[in-house]
Amino acid sequence: MSSSRPVFRSRWLPYLLVAPQLVITVIFFIWPAGEALWYSLQSVDPFGFSSQFVGLENFVALFHDSYYLDAFWTTIKFSALVTFSGLLVSLFFAALVDYVVRGSRFYQTLMLLPYAVAPAVAAVLWIFLFNPGRGLITHFLGEFGYDWNHAQNSGQAMFLVVFASVWKQISYNFLFFFAALQSIPRSLVEAAAIDGAGPIRRFFRLSLPLIAPVSFFLLVVNLVYAFFDTFPVIDAATAGGPVQATTTLIYKIYREGFTGLDLSASAAQSVVLMFLVIILTVVQFRYVESKVRYQ
């Protein structure tokens, strides 16, 4: 079997086609990452006019800071809850739509609506519903004797930001899961049904293994989403409180850099977060992807 390769009339045309993407990558990704790495090794004054090379002192100070370590473990817990809860809920809804015959179009449209809402707006929406004094959901919980006040209860605050973050990401996950389920040949599903496999068994024995590559892709995407893109939700919903119970690494970087004007500490934290995400992604590609290959 021979494979054909595209032939360009000019030897410079391939480089010209790739150049815009390379420029965007360098300007918006590589350059800022390099700047963060450089500032993490400096002691910079709040106005950025002068700096002094201090080596790894900023990193040493980080890991002796109890507030930073608390934010680190809060980030791990928050990211795990957002990632796995979002994937499970989205997969459940996608599986339901895959089996629904009547009204499936309306159901699909309804599931895609949260993706059109900005993260900060999603947070404000759920703040209204969970408002301790006038919220519809808190009023319902009060009827059962449950007192809700996420401004004073750290567990409730964590639940609120996780819930809002998952709700915002459901549409994205749902779209990929539903497309993956729809791509499974109907002949395989019908053959399994003829062999006596029920809907639940067909899903776990047939559908789930076949959509494993998509599940792995969404695992990586949701992990990055939980680490970085949930900042507007946390900022609008709890501002990292109460008592830093919902302060993640990305929010602490913002607070140190833009509120505390400690550019060196903020840069060091961003470098640690960057390498943490890189390590987790590499581990996933190395050990998880090998388990999603199928013939």
Swiss-Prot record:
Q: To which species is this protein native?
A: Salmonella typhimurium (strain LT2 / SGSC1412 / ATCC 700720)
A cellular-component GO term for this protein: plasma membrane
Q: Which residues cross the membrane?
A: 12-32, 81-101, 110-130, 158-178, 208-228, 263-283
How does the record say this protein sits in the membrane?
Multi-pass membrane protein
Q: Which of the residues are on side Cytoplasmic?
A: 1-11, 102-109, 179-207, 284-295
Subunit structure, per the record? The complex is composed of two ATP-binding proteins (UgpC), two transmembrane proteins (UgpA and UgpE) and a solute-binding protein (UgpB).
Task: Supply the name of the protein.
Answer: sn-glycerol-3-phosphate transport system permease protein UgpA
Tell me which CDD domains the record gives.
TM_PBP2
Per its database record, what is this protein's job? Part of the ABC transporter complex UgpBAEC involved in sn-glycerol-3-phosphate (G3P) import. Probably responsible for the translocation of the substrate across the membrane.
Q: Which SUPFAM superfamilies match?
A: MetI-like
- Topological domains annotated Periplasmic: 33-80, 131-157, 229-262
Gene3D superfamilies found in the cross-reference section: MetI-like
GO:BP terms for this protein?
A: transmembrane transport
Assigned protein family: Belongs to the binding-protein-dependent transport system permease family. UgpAE subfamily.
State if Cell membrane is listed as a keyword: yes
- Give UniProt keywords alphabetically: Cell inner membrane, Cell membrane, Membrane, Transmembrane, Transmembrane helix, Transport
Q: Which residue range or ranges hold the ABC transmembrane type-1 domain?
A: 76-284
Give its localization. Answer: Cell inner membrane
